Amino acid sequence: MISFSSFYQQIADSNLQHWLETLPSILGKWQRDHKHGNLPKWEKVLNKLHYPAPDQVDFVDSVTVGSGEQLSPGEKEKLENLLRLFMPWRKGPFHIHGIHIDTEWRSDWKWDRVKQHISPLKNRTVLDVGCGSGYHMWRMLGSGAKRVVGIDPSPLFLCQFEAVKRLAGPHHPVHLLPLGIEELPPLDAFDTVFSMGVLYHRRSPIDHLLQLRDQLRTGGELVLETLVIDGDENAVLVPQDRYGKMNNVWFIPSVAALMLWLKKCDFTDIRCVDTDVTALAEQRRTDWMPNESLVEYLDPNDITKTVEGYPAPKRATIIAIKNQPNQETVNG
């Protein structure tokens, strides 16, 4: 069974210690709720990942564990077969003992767009909301973060993350907890909070922004990356049914509308640092994710539109600072 005890020990004497009042029972319930699904099967695979400590790791320019020279061809083949049992791999890529996990998303491209605009992560405590299998968490660690906590309720993402961590070494201060942000108390403790690719999946985007704010210390930095449309501060797309074949897309605002929402939620120093139309090369079918991908979500005769006729995915990165909350505005 996946254990979270090392995380509990690490936060016992930190500014996250009050989380221990509720976290163990919440995670215990999550494990009980998933004991009859795929989780036990994936945990058996994790228990087979007994390999020597890697001769090198790189989280600065990539997520690389091992040089590829430690394992024999047979050992490498066995490891690859085990890692393939966690397919589909969506966020990456990862390089594990010479094995290239070519994920659906080139998450390294997103990181390259974001990292140049954020406050330095050195010695910061970081929260990554909707972290997937943890690719960006490793890159945050490589940027000098003191501790990185990711939350994502998916058991598959948890097991993919655990696979990489067990091969990289359990001592790294990076942790994935299978939670949604609505299960977090207001911690007011993180120096930087990332929410990338989450907002449009939330039925109440304002509530999501308030939940993100509640995790930041005053003066902490929010890094928000999400789908946007063109338009003024009143422009918001609400898909009638599906968007890019996804039935869980609720609100896609313009950059101006999103900045207004953040201001209403008592953020300050709000700025859009990047906009980017998702390229077909950034999200695509691979050997490690053989299902439909972006090309199938777009109009085959006009890739500037989704198959439903909406504008094709365009993403913006917004950075904002948590201001001292105005209780009358928030609660009034």
Curated annotation (Swiss-Prot):
Signal peptide segment: none
Domain of life of the source: Bacteria
InterPro entries linked to this entry: CmoB, Mo5U34_MeTrfas-like, SAM-dependent_MTases_sf
Gene Ontology MF terms in the entry: methyltransferase activity; transferase activity, transferring alkyl or aryl (other than methyl) groups
EC number, UniProt record: 2.5.1.-
PANTHER family: METHYLTRANSFERASE, TRNA U34 CARBOXYMETHYLTRANSFERASE
Function, in words: Catalyzes carboxymethyl transfer from carboxy-S-adenosyl-L-methionine (Cx-SAM) to 5-hydroxyuridine (ho5U) to form 5-carboxymethoxyuridine (cmo5U) at position 34 in tRNAs.
Family label: Belongs to the class I-like SAM-binding methyltransferase superfamily. CmoB family.
Name of the protein: tRNA U34 carboxymethyltransferase
Native source organism of the sequence: Shewanella putrefaciens (strain CN-32 / ATCC BAA-453)
Gene field: cmoB
